[in-house]
Each structure stands twice: as C-alpha cells, then as structure tokens.
Amino acid sequence: MFPGGGKFNPRMMKQMQKMMKDFGMDAEDLKAVKVTIELEDKLLVFEKPKVQVMDMLGNKTYSITGKAKKVAKEEEKIEDVEVKVEVTEEDIDMVSNQCGVSKEEAKKALEEVNGDLAEAILKLGN
C-alpha cells in the first residue's frame, strides 16, 4: 500500500497529511476514554481506544481502533412504582362542593384516582 516496499516513515506521513488537506480532507485524533457501540442484542465496548475523526468536505467519519469487548445487553427493567399522591384540603373541598358529597367521599375518590380532580368529579358524578 505504501511506496518503498511497505515501510512507513514519518516524512511520508507528513506528505500524506498535506495531500489530504489539498483534497479537502482533515483528520484529528480525539482523546476518547471509552467508546460504546449499541447493537440489537449486545454492546461493543472499547476501553482506551484510538479515535480519529476525518472531515471530508463536511462529512465526518469516525475511525475507532482498539480491542472490543462484547457485553450482553441487559433488558431495561421498568418497575411499576406505586405513587401515593397527597390530596390537599383545597382539592377535597372543590370536589365535595362540585359533586355535593361529603368530604370523606371526596377524599376517597381523589385518592382512588391519584389526585386527578376531573377524574374524581366524573367518578362521583355517575
């Protein structure tokens, strides 16, 4: 690939960089600590990678060099958490007055619908 029997020297590197700039290409090394690529079923994790970004006429290409470690992808677990909403006296009074029920009934309805005023009024209105 390289002239000179495949041997590579720093002077050639400078010439290549100059040629790249002449063609509108620019390369920059990034100081990355870790790179993670998320696939459908696993993760590829590169620890201490060499990352280079090449800009070719406004299009950026990232090159990652290093040893990839395959990591199983854990399913995201979403737990149902029961949230208890604190019902205010103001809300209880509003529902009680709107529906013509006792404050205890209004409070119970508000607790059942997690403090949703409209839902509590509809529930008591039926």
From Swiss-Prot:
The organism's lineage is:
Archaea, Methanobacteriati, Methanobacteriota, Methanomada group, Methanococci
Family recorded in the similarity comment: Belongs to the NAC-alpha family.
Q: Name one GO molecular function term.
A: RNA binding
Quaternary state and partners of this protein? Answer: Homodimer. Interacts with the ribosome. Binds ribosomal RNA.
Q: Which InterPro entries match?
A: NAC-like_UBA, NAC_A/B_dom_sf, NAC_arc, Nas_poly-pep-assoc_cplx_dom, UBA-like_sf
Report the protein name in the record: Nascent polypeptide-associated complex protein
Q: Which residues form the NAC-A/B domain?
A: 10-77
Provide this UniProt record's keywords sorted from A to Z.
Protein transport, RNA-binding, Transport
In the UniProt record, what gene is named as encoding this protein? Answer: nac
The record describes the protein's role as: Contacts the emerging nascent chain on the ribosome.
One Pfam assignment: UBA_HYPK
